[in-house]
């Protein structure tokens, strides 16, 4: 059994035209054992930046506090709002610096660029390797299930959009 399954949880983010959606479950537990049903896994980092943290809950809270601390320092030094891409790079660097005794959490960043209003979503593994697809991303113990459902729905949406063009 993976270390990630001890407190479980899954976070999903989808990007649209000028919008992002981020969703999660509220349960914390291992397999059939439920510890809590009101656990917050999505945290607001900036005006338009959200971070979802799955995995070991105490590590997720530690990572969240470090993200908020580094975001405040960034905005003080740079005198501007943090962009989602910058937040993702910052989190990735933070996780990679602790790779040998790392945090047991998988972050997901979703947000809108404050200047261009373009959506940005990305997911990371426990050592900070960034995966930033255009349409959807998931992290956590239910990641495989969410990705399958999203791929099926996305294929259906693309098929419905393109099918009328082919019939004409």
Regions found by a protein language model. Name each.
Residues 1-103, 128-168:
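Conserved short S/T/G-enriched processing/targeting/catalytic segments and their helical context
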Residues 107:
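Active-site rim beta-loop-alpha module in soluble metabolic enzymes
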Residues 110-128:
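Acidic-glycine-rich active-site phosphate/pyrophosphate-binding loop
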């Amino acid at each position: 059994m993976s270390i990630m399954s001890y407190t479980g949880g899954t976070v999903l983010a989808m990007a649209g035209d000028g919008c992002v959606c981020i969703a999660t479950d509220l349960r914390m537990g291992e397999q059939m054992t439920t510890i809590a049903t009101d656990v917050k896994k999505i945290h607001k980092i900036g005006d338009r930046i959200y971070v979802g943290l799955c995995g070991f809950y105490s590590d997720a809270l530690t990572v969240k506090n470090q993200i908020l601390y580094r975001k405040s320092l960034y905005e003080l030094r740079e005198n501007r709002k943090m962009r989602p891409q910058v937040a993702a790079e910052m989190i990735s660097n933070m996780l990679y610096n602790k790779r040998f005794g790392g945090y047991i959490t998988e972050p997901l960043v979703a947000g809108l660029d404050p200047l261009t209003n373009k959506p940005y979503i990305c997911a990371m593994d426990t050592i900070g390797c960034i995966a930033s697809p255009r349409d959807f991303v998931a992290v956590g113990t239910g990641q495989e299930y969410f990705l399958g459902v999203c791929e099926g729905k996305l294929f259906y949406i693309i098929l419905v959009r393109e099918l009328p063009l082919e019939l004409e």
